[in-house]
């Protein structure tokens, strides 16, 4: 859920196609580590 929420935050912020790096940056800002496998499933 955290990955979907981060993706949606990036999209609402004006990024029409958020990358994994964008989502990781959002998660890092609140102290959450990103799992690359799960993150890539959300992006693809």
Curated annotation (Swiss-Prot):
Record PTM: Phosphorylated.
Domain of life: Eukaryota
Sites bearing Phosphoserine, chain numbering: 17, 19
Keyword Phosphoprotein attached: yes
Positions carrying N6-acetyllysine: 21
GO molecular function ontology, one term from the record: structural constituent of ribosome
Residue numbers of N-acetylmethionine PTMs: 1
Gene Ontology terms: cellular component: cytosolic large ribosomal subunit
Cross-referenced InterPro entries: P1/P2_N_sf, Ribosomal_P2
UniProt-listed GO biological process terms: cytoplasmic translational elongation
Modified residues (N6-succinyllysine): 21
Keyword Ligase among UniProt keywords: no
Keywords (A to Z) from UniProt: Acetylation, Phosphoprotein, Ribonucleoprotein, Ribosomal protein
Stated family: Belongs to the eukaryotic ribosomal protein P1/P2 family.
Entry function: Plays an important role in the elongation step of protein synthesis.
The protein's assembly and partners: Heterodimer with RPLP1 at the lateral ribosomal stalk of the large ribosomal subunit.
Protein name: Large ribosomal subunit protein P2
Organism, scientific name: Oryctolagus cuniculus
Lineage: Eukaryota, Metazoa, Chordata, Craniata, Vertebrata
């Amino acid at each position: 859920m955290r990955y979907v929420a981060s993706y949606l935050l990036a999209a609402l912020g004006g990024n029409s196609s958020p990358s994994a790096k964008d989502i990781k940056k959002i998660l890092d800002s609140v102290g959450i580590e990103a799992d690359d496998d799960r993150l890539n499933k959300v992006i693809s």
